Amino acid sequence: DGNVEVTGTVSDSKGNLRSIPKTTKSANHSIVAADAGTLIATNSQITVQGSQMSVGDAVTILNNSGSSIVINRNSISLYNTGNGNNEDTSLGARGIATIYFQDAANAYISGSSLGS
């Protein structure tokens, strides 16, 4: 009937499929393919680069500081779903946002405390 039932943990190379793997970055970070499907906790600038991610990839950014951080674009269109603009943006203190990659050249960001 197409259903799969499992007793125990279902995992892949990044860990338990019911959890979002977390990495912590304390310096500026450029998103790379290995970041797909993860949460990046940071207090520093994030750069979203073109040609790094595949169709359907997603990365969540958690600003774990009391100040805004900058999310820059580099050779990619990054559309803020709050206003529809293709722009660099900021992520406010303790904010969280997810970036969805439509393809290698276009991504969408949505979340709390996004600015421009």
Region locations from a protein language model:
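Parallel beta-helix/beta-solenoid repeats that form elongated, surface-exposed shafts/blades used
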Residues: D1-G2, V6-G15, E87-T89
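Extracellular disulfide-bonded cysteine-rich modules/repeats
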Residues: G92-Q102
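Exposed extracellular interaction/assembly regions and N-terminal maturation sites
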Residues: V10-L78, F101-S116
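Terminal beta-strand-rich extracellular "head" domains
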Residues: S75-L91
